[in-house]
């Protein structure tokens, strides 16, 4: 059995920006403290929610290094090392490894895509050249490419490929993956509205967008399930379904950043091509006050501004 990078709730952390678009490293440290104080079990930086496609190599390396240094071993730090080019993904992975990341989150190649055989070659090529554990990331709604259960099985044979963040939403495929891979591949839910469903099939936690604004609630949702109180976990899952939906009323991370700013967390806007939340998104999204009310009802800590 391979050792899991973490068990519990990891936050897919936003990248805070100043008004001029530069990275707000002081705010990044505040967000790290806020997450740790509210029981988050691991921190994921430079992934989708962290706007990785708009980060330069230098910014990516600096975010990972600063996060590792500031977290100082309090929780594992996982770096997104996503690219649709194998050599670039390897460079990002090498940079993150040198910076001290505890894990690498690696999405399937997007746009140019590949075959299932190509996926195996792509991930194994990188896994052969790093020693840091790799968490695969399957999100076909963004990449246009799905990792099949049989492909997971082949990838799970590599000693450095230890887990996956599964966000395709297909519970039947998840069950087949668990059946094929067993303890050789740790499963993390990539969808906040499917945490308990995934855990019923053996998942060990979640990599969460919701944790940016409700870290204690997401932590409790996972912990109660792992502790055997599935009823309490399910109750929390159902309680937060509407909030989960509101955070995906527009392209992630536009809504969660707007919610954080409304709560006084001052994380700034997204970089282009992402824009402000659109009118149709505003129509579907709960107001900032309601998001804050739902978050407070979880028993979590107050926003950073308070």
Where are these regions (language model features)?
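A general structural signal for well-ordered alpha-helical segments in protein cores
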Residues: 28, 60, 64, 89, ...
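Catalytic alpha/beta core domains of metabolic enzymes, predominantly
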Residues: 128-129, 142-248
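Alpha-helical structural signal in soluble globular domains
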Residues: 62, 66-71, 95, 99, ...
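C-terminal alpha-helical cap/extension of soluble enzyme domains
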Residues: 5-16, 34, 38-40, 200-203, ...
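Glycine-rich phosphate-binding "P-loop"
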Residues: 138, 160-161, 271-272
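Active-site beta->alpha loop and helix N-cap motifs at the rims of alpha/beta catalytic domains
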Residues: 2-11, 15-144
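Catalytic cores of TIM-barrel enzymes
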Residues: 2-5, 38, 176-179, 185, ...
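Helix N-cap/beta->alpha junction signal
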Residues: 85, 191-192, 278
């Amino acid at each position: 059995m391979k050792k899991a990078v973490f068990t519990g709730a990891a936050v897919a952390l936003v990248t805070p920006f100043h008004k001029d678009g530069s990275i707000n490293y002081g705010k990044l440290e505040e967000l790290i403290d806020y997450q740790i104080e509210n029981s988050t079990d691991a921190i994921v930086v430079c992934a989708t929610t962290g706007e990785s496609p708009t980060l330069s190599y230098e910014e990516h390396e600096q975010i990972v290094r600063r996060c590792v240094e500031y977290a100082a071993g309090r929780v594992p730090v996982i770096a997104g090392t996503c690219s649709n080019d194998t050599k670039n993904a390897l460079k990002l992975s090498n940079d993150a490894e040198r910076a001290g990341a505890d894990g690498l989150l690696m999405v399937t190649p997007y746009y140019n895509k590949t075959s299932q055989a190509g996926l195996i070659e792509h991930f194994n090529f990188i896994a052969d050249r790093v020693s840091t554990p790799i968490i695969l990331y399957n999100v076909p709604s963004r990449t246009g490419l799905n990792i099949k259960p049989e492909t997971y099985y082949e990838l799970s044979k590599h000693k450095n490929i230890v887990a996956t963040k599964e966000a395709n939403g297909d519970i039947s495929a998840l069950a087949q993956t668990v059946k094929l891979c067993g303890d050789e591949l740790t499963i993390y839910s990539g969808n906040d509205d499917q945490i308990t469903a995934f855990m019923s099939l053996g998942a060990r936690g979640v990599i969460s967008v919701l944790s940016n604004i409700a870290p204690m609630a997401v932590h409790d949702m996972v912990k109660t399930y792992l502790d055997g109180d599935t009823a309490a976990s399910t109750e929390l899952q159902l309680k937060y379904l509407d909030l989960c939906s509101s955070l995906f009323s527009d392209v992630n991370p536009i809504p969660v950043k707007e919610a954080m700013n409304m709560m006084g967390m001052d994380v700034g806007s997204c970089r282009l091509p992402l824009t402000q939340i659109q009118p149709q998104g505003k129509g579907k999204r709960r107001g900032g006050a309601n998001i804050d009310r739902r978050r407070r009802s979880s028993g979590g800590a107050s926003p950073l501004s308070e």
